[in-house]
Amino acid sequence: MLLSNVHIWNYRLLLDTNIHLDEALTLIVGKNNAGKTSFLSILQRVLSGRKDLDFADYPIQCRSTLYEVLWKVVKGKISIDKAKDLIPKTAIQFDIDYSNEAEDEYLGALSPFIIDLDINNNIARILVEYQSLLSDTIISEITDKISLLKVTNPTAKSKKSSEIIAISNYLSTNFNKIFEISVKAINPSNPSVFQIREVSHLRDVFIFKRISAERGLDELDNHDKKPIGQVMERIFQDGVIPFEENITKKIEKLKAYVEQESIKAQDEINKLLEEIITKMIRFGYPTAEDLQLKATTQILLKDNIIKDTDLAYSISGENETLPSSHNGLGYKNLIKIVFLLQEFAQEIKKNSLSAIPLLFLEEPEAHMHPQLQTVFVKYISEVLEGFTGNKIQILISTHSSYIANSVPFTQIRYFKRLKECVICKNLTDFYNTCQNDEEKQNNLQFLHKYMTISRCDLYFCDKVILVEGAAERLLIPDMIHKCDQAGLFNTKSPTLASQYCSIIEVGGAYAHKFFDFIDFLGIPALILTDIDFVTLHGKNCLKDKAKRTSNATIMKWCRDKLNIPLSTSVKIEDVYKLISDDKLTNGFRHIEFQKEENGYHARSLEEAIMNVNRDLYSISHSDSTFSFDSENQKKTNFSLQLLTDDDYLDYQTPSYIVDGLIWLNNQDKVVYPVTITVKEKNKRKLTLKTIKD
C-alpha cells in the first residue's frame, strides 16, 4: 500500500494545495519560500500526533475572518456553535491506495480507516482537522482583553478596530486554546460519511522519518558533540544487544575481562558498520583510494552500556587512524544520511504492522559536489530498500538542478509561490498531456535529455531567457547590467538585475520545444532569437532578397499568433506582421528578434551589435551590406572582446534585446492559467489573471 495523495488546507501559504505522491520517489522542487518546508512541517506535526496548532502557522489570509468571527461572538451577534462553522480550519487529508494488497491480506494499522464496504474501492481516506475549541471561557477571556485595552488605549480612533487588535493580541499568546486535532476516517465514495478515530490510530499508520536540511556536520577538534557518532550509538545499541546481555550475566567478572570484551564489542560494531558501508558504496564512497571508515567505542563499567561511538579514518592496509573531523563536509553529509537511513530501517523492522514507511529528506545536496548529488538520488531508493527489504516512499526536497534533472518528469512536483498562496504542479500531468500528440511527445523527450545534460535550473528561477548560443549567454548578463545602469528598469523593484533569471542556451531551432513546458510552469520567458533571412530555396540572404525565415521558433510563433495552418508556408511578411500587429507576446512568453536600425536589418546578434556600434568596428554609416564572418571570427571571441577589451566596454545594446529585457523586467507574478494562442487545431482559451507585486 502507498500514500497516493495529500491535500492541505490553511497551513501557512498552503491554502488549498494538492500533492500527488509517486509510489517510490517524489522530488519536491521550487524556489526558496515556495512552501516545500511548510509541507514537511505539517506532515511532521500531524504524523507525530501534535494536538495543538501554532499561531505563526495559521495563514494570514484566514486571520481577518477569525478575528471578525470572534468579535461577533463577543458582541452577541452569533453563537459559539455558529462561529465554529465559520472559522477557517487547518486540515490535511491523506489518500492511501491499498489496491496492490491481496484480498485476504491483513491491512494492519490501516484497518480502522477503511469504512467503505464497496469492494471496488481501494482508497482509505484520513482527514485530520484542527477543530475549534471555542467556549464560554475563551470568549470571557477575550472580553477581558478588550476591556483591558480600553483602559490602556482610550483614544483609539475606531472602537471595532481596537477590539480586533485586542482579539489579535489574545490569540498570539493563547492560540493553543483555540484549536485541537481531530482525526476522521472518511468514506471516499461519500465524503459526508465519516467515523471519528484516535490520534494514536493515525500514528500507527505511518512510520515517518525526517532528515532535515540542518543536519549538524561540524565537528570541531576536542569538541564533545559528534553528530555522526551520536547516530552510530543509537544504531549500534540495537545491533549489539545480545552481546550486552552476555556482559550482564558476567557482571561480577567484568572487570577482569573488560579489555577482552571491549575488543569483541569493537569487532561486533565493525561488522555492522561494514554492512552499512557495503550498501553506501552504491553512492561512490568510500573507494579503495579514500580513507577507510572504522568505528571506535568504549564500554563504561558504571553504565554497562556502549558509549562514545565515533567514526575514524584509516589508509587502506594501515592501522593508524585519523579522527572524523578530518573528513570533508560533503562525505560527512553522505555518511550521516546513510546512518540515519539505517536507523530508520531499524524503526521500520520494529513496527512491522504499520502500513506506510515515509521518509522525507530535506535538501540532501548540502556540501555534496554535483556528481555525488546525481549518484545519490539515483540509488537512494535501492539502498534504503536494501536496508529494510521493503519498498519505502521517499520525499526529497531540493534546490539542486543536478538532482532535479536526474529523475523523470513523473516524479517531480513543482511548488510555485504566488502572491498569497502556493500551488503544486504535478509534472505527471504535463507528461500525460504530451502522450497523445506526436510532436509534443518528441518535445518531451528532447526536454528531458536537454535538461539532464545542461543541468537546466528552470525549477528555481523567477524568469527565464532562451537564447541562440554561447555569444548571447555570455553577453546577456552584461546587457542586463547596462540597461539597469541606464535606468531602463526603474518601473520595477527589485529590477531584473536583482531577480533570479535563468539563461538557457538552446537556439532558434529548438526554443519552441520549451513553449508547452514554460506555459505549464507559469514562468515569464523571453525568447531572443535570430530572424535568419533566407531565399525561397533556403539560402542565407539579406533582407531585400528574403522570402521567409529558416528559424523554427519564429515560424511556430507565426503559426500560433496568426493562425497559419501547417499546410501553408510562413512568409517573411508574416514575420514582419508580428511586430506591426504587436503579436510578440503570447501568454507568459515574449519573443524578440533583430529589427531594422540605422537603415540596416541585421540577421544575427553579432551583426546587430556591429550595426549599432559602427565606429567600434570601423563600419561606414552608409554601409548596408556588411556582415559578420562566422567562418573567420569565432562568436565567443567576439563576445569576450566586448566584455574584456577596454576599447569595447561601452558598446551599445541592440534595440531588440533592450525591448525584450524591458518586457521581462516589467512582468509581474501571475496566476495560471493565462490566455495562450496556438494554431487552430489545438487552440485553447483560458482566463487571463495577473497579480501585481
Regions found by a protein language model. Give the residues of each.
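Glycine-rich phosphate-binding loops of NTPases
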Residues: 57-248, 542-582
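Switch/communication elements of ASCE P-loop NTPase nucleotide-binding domains
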Residues: 1-48, 312-454, 658-693
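Flexible phosphate/Mg2+-sensing switch loops adjacent to catalytic phosphate-binding sites
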Residues: 48-81, 345-354, 386-395, 420-426, ...
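Acidic, Mg2+-coordinating catalytic modules of nucleic-acid enzymes
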Residues: 200, 447-466, 470-693
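Conserved nucleotide-binding/hydrolysis micro-motifs of P-loop NTPases
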Residues: 45, 98-101, 131-136, 215-218, ...
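Short alpha-helical segments and helix-capping/turn motifs at coil-helix boundaries
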Residues: 73-80, 109-114, 184-201, 278, ...
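Short glycine-/polar-rich loops that comprise or flank the Walker A/P-loop
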Residues: 88-90, 121-126, 204-208, 355-356, ...
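Extended helical coiled-coil dimerization/tether regions that scaffold
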Residues: 205, 209, 213, 217-361
